Amino acid sequence: MAETRRKVLEVLNGKSLTPPPIWLMRQAGRYLPEYRATRAKAGSFLDLCYTPDLAVEVTLQPIRRYAFDAAILFSDILVIPDALHRNVRFEEGHGPRMDPIDTDGIAGLKADGILSHLSPVFETVARLRRELPEETTLLGFCGAPWTVATYMIAGRGTPDQAPARLFAYRHPKAFEELLAFLADVSADYLVAQIDAGADAVQIFDSWAGVLGEDEFARFAVEPVRRMIASVRARRPSAKIIAFAKGAGLLLKDYRRLTGADAIGLDWAVPLAFAAELQKDGPVQGNLDPMRVVAGGGAMESGIDRILDVLGNGPLIFNLGHGITPEADPENVSALVARVRGTKG
């Protein structure tokens, strides 16, 4: 019997595959009618994340429909602040909300009980690894310390995360303590996901793009480096993707400085620059999600350009950020077919 291949893992090990493996950020999401039906049963969004029966189901839905090469655990980057009792809630039309943290709150943070609070997530991971096709890579994930901290400081998302940037300037010691704490507990969380059955993990730094050069080094690079070093100290073979959205030219040294195996690229990263980054190792991305909403020629030309420029090197095809609720599931079918059929 032929050995089962997990193509995403092969690329994370530096192999170039034609066609490249494909999965999509937020592939389990509101664009799918089956997701909306399951979501309606769940109660709150966090109930969906913490109920293994439901979290397993929504993770598997896009695999059944599209046979993506990877499944990504259905959860949220804000389960860490939820485990820290920050009263996290998701309000319709307003996004995430939580109790803002101050310097006293940072001084009082304790890691006790975080992993037990998140035990339903690990049950979901273990069940997914049993239920997924053998060839499907299972990805775990967490938020990067900077991005999680922005929500903890402001108590919500803001257009440019000015509250966290201001807090970092006014209270530099407390802010760096918060980032170090989040790096350590997030590393513990990723190790637990790997131990439960995740084949690889992704670190999402969705708000890296609001940082200046010096702040990027201190708040985006250093905490992620600390996380990855902590994971690798315990699980040396761990495969890690790091996605610093909006980082632009600061991605040049991001892989080397953080130790990530692969770097995620948003849709604004020029493909010529992406090709330079790919010389150092695998890249993931980077189709504009709006091309999937548009479909047709706009989507096809975007796919073809990425494959033309990056398809001969180690590439995991993905979007440049999460798929949006307006995307037509049929367009996603066409996307997958074109990625798998254009080359080779």
Swiss-Prot record:
Its EC number is 4.1.1.37. One of its GO terms (molecular function) is uroporphyrinogen decarboxylase activity. One of its GO terms (biological process) is protoporphyrinogen IX biosynthetic process from glutamate. Pathway: Porphyrin-containing compound metabolism; protoporphyrin-IX biosynthesis; coproporphyrinogen-III from 5-aminolevulinate: step 4/4. It catalyses: uroporphyrinogen III + 4 H(+) = coproporphyrinogen III + 4 CO2. SUPFAM superfamilies: UROD/MetE-like. GO terms for cellular component: cytosol. The record marks D76 as: Transition state stabilizer. Gene3D superfamilies: 3.20.20.210. It holds the Pfam family URO-D. Its main location: cytoplasm. Keywords: Cytoplasm, Decarboxylase, Lyase, Porphyrin biosynthesis. Substrate binds at R26, Q27, A28, G29, R30, D76, Y151, S206, H321. It is found in: Cytoplasm. Homodimer. Catalyzes the decarboxylation of four acetate groups of uroporphyrinogen-III to yield coproporphyrinogen-III. Belongs to the uroporphyrinogen decarboxylase family. PANTHER family: METHYLTETRAHYDROFOLATE:HOMOCYSTEINE METHYLTRANSFERASE RELATED (PTHR21091), UROPORPHYRINOGEN DECARBOXYLASE (PTHR21091:SF169). This is Uroporphyrinogen decarboxylase. The gene is hemE.
